[in-house]
Amino acid sequence: MRGCTLLLFSEAPFLREQEVAVITAYRNVFIQDDPGMHFRWVIRNAEGQRRWRCRNSEPDAGKVLNTRLASDGPLRQ
């Protein structure tokens, strides 16, 4: 993502309020299995194939999400 500014997030588990900021900022980040408080982050490539998925409640969800966004997360224009 040369020439882009990364929007990084907390390295701790994510809260519901942070979900909106992430899916608003990145065009290939989606929410899956959303029954309320617990959900999964999904990053898809340009062809729609899943590149990565994790639960928001995992201890290092934010750390791994930031790493994946650095390589696979184009910002919305």
Swiss-Prot record:
Transmembrane segments: none annotated. Pfam families: DUF905 (PF06006). InterPro entries: DUF905, YkfF-like_sf. Belongs to the UPF0401 family. This is UPF0401 protein c0279.
